[in-house]
């Protein structure tokens, strides 16, 4: 509904009506009365057009007009309006929202009610139905069909299934509803045709009393059929709203499950499900160790219970700190990935822009070369050519400079990585040299009795220098000089016999 124009939509069977001109004092009874009056006006116009058509093709004195065809399904204009045949007290407006419905009292301010729904207005529908096709109470109810029993022939089998329509297919239900519409339209046409004839007849009172009973029977049948049609269409609206609500709930459930899954992946890793199962299996295996006796298990439980609570609190605090650091690490990792993606995207955009500019400049340069030179250009033409040449050289230099800058950054990153690898190898080599020196001091004899501390001080430094010189010699020598193995480590160790006398002499 548009609040500026004060309009509201009301469904009548399968047709949507827009009621305009509403005010804050408009009630549901006013809307029902307006809709019934509109239906009466439309029926009068249809009857008038039918009479004008029948006047052009008159029937015989005892000939009745042809009944409507049973297979005619295109009479959509007359069907909804032909069913509104009764006083306003026989109709009511039902409010439907997400599969629930309630009967609106006649004194309800419908415009105020519509404004109170707020954001849920798109899920609310107002349906005009007969009062017999809805529940007597005004509370909300779910989509449960009600069976309207016949007053002439009550149902003999009370124990019959309450919902035989559930076993029917959708196409069969559609055919039943269409047949009910056609039958209702046929009864309405017969009643409209018999009304003028009954007013102009001058038969006796006995004949009029005999003809009134079938007319009453037909009117009751029309009312029951109209009630049934309104009930079916009301349930159709309710079912459609429930199906829409189910789709919305499915989308919300999928969104929540995806959010929970991503949260768990962020906290516990990608394979958190597999890790959970493995942890559970490990606990079960630990709990069912075959070689452990119940007494030992009880003793371990008592020791765990007798442990001081401070250890448990410290462990819990350590776990919390570890979890916090893990969360921080994950957050930093995500930020790093985002920054890398942004950097790659910007680099690709810059490269694409440079390529486009280069190609544009190149095309302009080729086009300028292909154009013939004007003989009367004079110094202006030469100046333009010189300016174009300088601009082309400048763009070329800019492009080449940017490419060289990119290559320089790549070389710098490779150089930093190589420097880091060299530092790590250097530290590893120094650690190996220190370990080897310690082993040599352990294996060597304790030394001469007259040796003192000043004579032992230059020993490690001299050994370290010697091993560095040997390592440099191995690095300079090719792989063909290594006779023991391919790595060269065995040749390094093969020089132990040469280095031991020097160490011993220094000691």
From Swiss-Prot:
The keyword Cytoplasm applies. SUPFAM superfamilies: Ubiquitin-like. The lineage of its organism: Eukaryota, Metazoa, Chordata, Craniata, Vertebrata. Residues 4-133 form the Ras-associating domain. Plays an important role in regulating embryonic neurogenesis. Residues 68-78 have a biased composition (Acidic residues). It comes from Homo sapiens. It holds the Pfam family RASSF8-10_RA. Keywords: Coiled coil, Cytoplasm, Cytoskeleton, Neurogenesis. This is Ras association domain-containing protein 10. Residues 237-264, 319-358 form a coiled coil. Residues 46-80, 185-222, 444-507 are annotated as: Disordered. It comes from the Eukaryota. Residues 197-213, 447-460 have a biased composition (Low complexity). Expressed in brain. Tends to be down-regulated in astrocytic gliomas due to promoter methylation. Methylation occurs early in gliomagenesis and the extent of methylation parallels with higher glioma grades, so that methylation is observed in close to 70% WHO grade IV primary glioblastomas, but not in grade I astrocytomas. GO terms for cellular component: centrosome; cytosol; spindle pole. GO terms for biological process: nervous system development; positive regulation of neural precursor cell proliferation; positive regulation of neurogenesis; signal transduction. The gene is RASSF10. It is found in: Cytoplasm, Cytosol; Cytoplasm, Cytoskeleton, Microtubule organizing center, Centrosome; Cytoplasm, Cytoskeleton, Spindle pole. InterPro entries: N-RASSF, RA_dom, RASSF10_RA, RASSF8/10_RA, Ubiquitin-like_domsf. Residues 487-498 have a biased composition (Polar residues).
